């Protein structure tokens, strides 16, 4: 029951913040132009800053565990490959990019640290999970959303060049690269810089959620209901059921296992919507999946934690 209450305390505010954006649009405080500008702002500034902060403040040298990093990297890679293969079943295929991204990409950074701190009193192995998965999440999201853009056509030389340029200049990628270099060089974080960066980073999630709520049209978000349900199932249950036994077999327990559970089975992040919207996709499918996974993850995540706790693994 405590785990359920904790998970609800994490997920319900996310759900309500999203609905606030929808409410503000309904009463006229938000209009389409304002929501589009807010989406663009979150994509270009707060979101890259949040990723920069998450990675830059990790002491990579001190936290490093090769086995953990390699395992998280490999299962994330396999999850992406499975999502790409499953997306081939979609007809019409205009939502392939959104389906792939939303089915593998978790709220790992924020939720992982929160859950582990609640269970063990410190961040534990969450930073390692972030190092192994979050950069890969974002790099592959840029690739997937570029390659599977609805109007993309064939990947000829011109399209490939434009795609590669979009990847290299993507604000998300730049934030990750800057954060990684900062951490590797062990550059200091002066108090003034830390507070300023922190304040800006804190705006990413609430603004992104309200922008998503303001863009939400329920009939569009769930117009491809079977695909949305399939995507939600893979995000919350499918990959967890596939890889959690493997993690246990590899000897991961306690905070390491909790990190892996969060990485595999937490809700799709609002970043899915923000990036899709800003990279030539409609974004409606992403918003529907974020809504569904946020709603159900409190129960599925609690179930996975309960099972592992009952087995004495966490």
How should each PLM-predicted stretch be described?
Residues 1-314:
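Alpha-helical transmembrane segments of multi-pass small-molecule/ion transporters
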């Amino acid at each position: 029951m405590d785990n359920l209450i904790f998970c609800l305390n994490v997920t319900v505010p996310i759900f309500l913040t999203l609905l606030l954006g929808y409410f503000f649009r309904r009463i006229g405080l938000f209009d389409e132009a304002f929501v589009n500008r807010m989406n663009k702002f979150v994509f270009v500034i707060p979101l890259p800053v949040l990723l920069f902060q998450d990675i830059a403040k990790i002491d990579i040298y001190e936290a490093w565990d090769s086995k953990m990093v390699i395992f998280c990297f490999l299962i994330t890679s396999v999850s992406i490959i499975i999502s790409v293969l499953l997306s081939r079943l979609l007809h019409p295929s205009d939502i392939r990019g959104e389906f792939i991204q939303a089915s593998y990409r978790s709220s790992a950074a924020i939720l992982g640290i929160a859950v582990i701190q609640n269970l063990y009193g410190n961040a534990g192995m969450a930073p390692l999970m972030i190092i192994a998965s979050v950069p890969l999440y974002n790099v592959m999201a840029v690739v997937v959303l570029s390659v599977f853009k609805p109007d993309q056509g064939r990947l000829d030389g011109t399209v490939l060049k434009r795609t590669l340029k979009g990847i290299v200049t993507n604000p998300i990628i730049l934030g990750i690269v800057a954060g990684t270099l900062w951490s590797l060089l062990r550059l200091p974080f002066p108090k003034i810089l830390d507070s300023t960066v922190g304040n800006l980073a804190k705006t990413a999630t609430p603004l992104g959620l309200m922008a998503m709520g303001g863009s939400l049209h329920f009939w569009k978000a769930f117009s491809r209901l079977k695909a949305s349900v399939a995507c939600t199932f893979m995000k919350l249950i499918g990959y967890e059921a596939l890889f959690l036994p493997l993690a246990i077999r590899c000897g991961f327990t306690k905070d390491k296992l909790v990190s892996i559970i969060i990485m595999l089975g937490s809700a799709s992040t609002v970043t899915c919507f923000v990036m899709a919207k800003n990279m030539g996709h409609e974004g409606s499918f992403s918003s529907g999946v974020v809504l569904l996974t946020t709603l159900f993850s409190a129960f599925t995540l609690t179930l996975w934690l309960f099972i592992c706790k009952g087995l004495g693994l966490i």
